[in-house]
Regions:
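Structural detector for short beta-strands of small beta-barrel domains
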Residues: 2-17, 53, 625-629
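Short aromatic-glycine-enriched beta-strand elements
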Residues: 16-27, 634-640
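Accessory alpha-helical DNA-binding modules that contact the DNA backbone or grooves
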Residues: 22-30, 35-36, 44-54, 59-273, ...
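Pre-P-loop entry segment of helicase/translocase ATPase cores
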Residues: 152, 221-222, 266-326
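Conserved RecA-like ASCE P-loop NTPase motor core of nucleic-acid helicases/translocases
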Residues: 337-379, 449, 512-517, 534-555
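Conserved helicase motor core of SF1/SF2 NTP-dependent helicases
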Residues: 353, 357-363, 372-379, 390-398, ...
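Conserved helicase motor core of P-loop NTPases
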Residues: 452-618
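C-terminal accessory regions
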Residues: 614-617, 622-739
Length: 739
């Protein structure tokens, strides 16, 4: 991009986003008006600026100047000074007062304000107090202007520069030059990598103490994104050495200091030193304690429970098998129960019977699941209202950033109910489990339901698996495939996959198909035909309801390539559809998209077709999908309708948290259910291409599974029971609590 420079004064501001500073304004340049767009720090009408950027042609609004950076210039002639002071930029000065000030001090006005502010009292209508207030405002604007220039010379964009200035004010000079790594802790949007680049520019040594400490914490943060709550010391050191380019002894020398600063916790287990980020250690430890506190027993005679079960069976015309009946009994007798089982094993019937039992006892029951889709499905199968765990806990938007959850319901304001049933527990990570348990008081029954053979949560921890593996709590495993489920080859084959048994690929099934193709492009062509022509009629659904699931993000059959191809096929470019390009991805009106990061501060609304708001709240979560309804370049937002009809005005600045969702990774699909799924399949890394992944993909389909690809890879995945190691200590914490 060839940068151009324009100089002029701000005639008027058309639009300004107070949250991120995005502004559309009219700049008068050589007596001609020019529309400028960009992020402006605290700019006001009447100000003189020198702007750097490029001319662009907007499809709707015509010629614009897209500003990359700018500097405010003090007005040089008396007319410009008067225009600036009277513009409203300085609170308390109107047009008449501005004229009197300039008439008195002429071109010397700004020097007087900055160096001899008390002299402003010479002007009629200005007291000594008001004179100092005016000077303070002018000086604050000068400080901000100088800070912006200072930060931009280090490559910091204007949006981030405003955040940094708002956090540190005049301290930014010392922070940036002495320890820029503070920013990674203090400011959302500044991670270790950004701070490290800034540190290199200002000459911070690569082996400085605060760089190594910050690097260690960054490695633990990245490990959490991979699902780990801790790393063994040897592994942490290896990763930190690779990241920082220093010696292992230099890394190890900082562990004790970080522990003393309460940034990390070091735990010795079986001769291995486990190193936790402080937060995750205490989440695991307190989760174990709270689980044990809920694990109480209730003395209810078997004969009484069995009589109630028979009564419910008679009314519902459903008969429980012995494991289901045992689950109901355990739910009545225990404060904490885990129910696990694969598809078609009667989890829903069991949950419904438990609900009806407690309902007959006059007890209040809350139902919840980790995602909106899972909660909706729970509502449909039980006939009772189910909410997301976040909504049940009354998410309040969290702390200072978009990625930290805060809930109204906690130990000081617990959930007021007798029974809580959580479905799809395999998706619950340690952070959400900790928040849930804080809001559950002793005496409340907690029933955790899930399929332990599904992939673990996207977030850190292996909560369901660790709870079961601890052996500390009552657990009922449902194994029988019921008659109505046994007619579905999706369910039958899912269990065969889970057990490592051979699956027939003769395509004689009514809901499970394998189309053999061995070339990526041929696989893609078949996938397109299935989505556009075959499957919508076969499963009575729209093409948007059919989901492509793939093991990987990269590669010929990865999410990134498939989404570009599927978008062009399903939602091609059209003059009537507005678009927004972001880092190589085109987002278009009508696109299917997915949120890829928890954001607890995005506001949403549910409205009727007449525009009446019937519900509103906060939070869009990792894995939530939606459709882009409208793109507004002027406001720099797009309207997205997410699951459950939640409409969001999604700002462009958050587009790094959004991606196309015509194809998604199997891991991201966890907890969702689709009428039909298409799984393109070729060989890949052994640790990824395993039984667990294939089982999860197949169980996402309600009516039809179609796998397109190499049958050898399919069979190898069934036989490959290896899984990537996930470092999680909840099981050990629970065992310690029971000793």
């Amino acid at each position: 991009m060839e940068t151009e420079t324009v100089t002029g004064y701000v005639d008027h501001i058309i639009y300004r986003n107070a949250e991120n500073g995005y502004t559309v304004l009219v700049l008068v340049v050589n007596e001609e008006e020019l529309t400028c767009v960009g992020t402006f720090s605290d700019i006001a009408e009447g100000e003189n600026i020198e702007a750097h950027g490029e001319y662009t042609e907007h499809a709707t609004y015509g010629r614009q100047f897209k500003v990359v950076s700018f500097e405010e210039k003090e007005p040089e002639d008396e007319m410009a000074i008067e225009r600036y002071l009277g513009s409203g930029a300085i609170h308390g000065i109107g047009l008449a007062l501005a004229a009197r000030i300039v008439r008195r001090f002429k071109k010397d006005t700004f020097r007087i304000i900055e160096e001899e502010p008390e002299r402003l009292a010479e002007v009629k209508g200005i007291s000594q107090r008001k004179a100092m207030e005016i000077a303070d405002q002018v000086n604050a604007k000068r400080d901000l202007r100088e800070a912006m220039i200072f930060l931009q010379q280090y490559g910091i964009n204007m949006n981030l520069a405003v955040k940094i200035y708002n956090k540190y004010g005049g301290e930014i000079y010392s922070v940036l030059k002495e320890n820029p790594y503070r920013m990674a802790d203090d400011i959302d949007g500044v991670g270790f990598k950004t701070a490290d680049e800034l540190a290199a520019r200002v000459g911070i040594k690569t082996d400085s103490d605060f760089r190594i400490k910050s690097g260690i914490q960054y490695v633990l943060q990245q490990a959490a994104m991979d699902g780990h709550t801790y790393l063994p010391m040897e592994e942490l050191t290896r990763r930190a050495v690779y990241l920082l380019g220093v010696e292992s002894s230099q890394v190890e020398a900082h562990y004790m200091n970080l522990a003393m600063d309460r940034k990390i916790v070091m735990q010795l287990k079986d001769d291995i030193t486990q190193i936790y980020a402080n937060t995750f250690y205490y989440m695991e430890a307190n989760t174990a304690v709270m689980l044990k506190q809920l694990d109480v027993t209730y003395d209810v005679p078997d004969i009484e429970i069995e009589a109630a079960i028979r009564n419910i069976e008679k009314k519902t015309e459903m008969e429980l098998d012995e494991h289901q009946a045992e689950a109901v009994k355990e739910a009545v007798r225990n404060g904490l129960l885990v129910i696990t089982g694969g598809p078609g094993t009667g989890k829903t019937t069991t949950i419904n019977t438990i609900i009806k039992y407690f309902e007959l006892e006059g007890m209040d029951i809350f139902l919840a699941a980790p995602t909106g889709r899972a909660a909706k499905r729970m509502s449909e199968t039980t006939g009772y209202e189910a909410r997301t765990i976040h909504r049940m806990l009354e998410l309040n938007g969290g702390m200072d950033t978009g990625s930290t959850a805060g809930f109204e319901r906690n130990e000081r304001n617990p959930l007021e109910t007798d029974v809580i049933i959580i479905d799809e527990m395999s998706m619950v990570d340690i952070s959400l489990m900790y928040s849930l348990l804080k809001a559950v008081v002793a005496g409340t029954r907690l029933i955790l339901v899930g399929d332990v053979n599904q992939l673990p949560s996207v977030g850190p921890g292996s909560v369901l698996k660790d709870i079961i593996d601890s052996g500390a709590f009552h657990t009922v495993k449902l194994t029988k495939i019921f008659r109505q489920a046994s007619t579905s080859d999706i369910i039958v084959n899912a269990h065969k996959i889970n057990n490592g048994e051979e699956v027939s690929l003769d395509n004689k099934s009514m809901d499970f198909f394998f189309l053999k193709r061995y070339d990526a492009d041929k696989i893609i062509n078949v996938t397109l035909q299935l989505i556009k022509q075959k499957l919508p009629k076969f499963v009575n659904a729209t093409e948007y309801d059919i989901q492509v699931l793939t093991p990987m993000r990269k590669g010929l059959l990865g999410v990134e390539r498939l989404n570009g191809i599927l978008q062009a096929y399903m939602n091609p470019a059209d003059k009537s559809k507005r678009e927004k390009e972001y880092r190589g991805t085109i987002f278009r009106e009508g696109d299917k998209v997915m949120q890829i990061k928890n954001n607890y501060q995005i506001e949403w609304e549910i409205r009727t077709k007449f525009g009446l708001c019937v519900d509103k709240g906060m939070g869009i979560f990792n894995g939530d999908t939606g459709i882009i309804e409208e793109i507004n370049d002027f406001a720099e937002t797009m309207t997205i309708s997410f699951d459950e009809g939640r409409k969001v005005e999604y700002p462009f600045k958050l587009l790094e948290e959004l991606e196309l969702a015509y194809a998604v990774t199997i891991h991201k699909s966890q907890g969702s259910e689709y009428p039909a799924v298409v799984i393109p399949l070729l060989s890949g890394p052994r640790m990824l291409m395993n039984r667990n992944l294939l089982y999860t993909a197949v169980t996402r389909a309600k009516k039809c599974v179609t796998i397109v690809g190499d049958e050898q890879t399919f069979y190898e995945m069934i036989q490959n029971n290896s899984q990537q190691r996930r470092y999680s200590g909840l099981r050990d914490r629970i065992v310690e609590e029971t000793i």
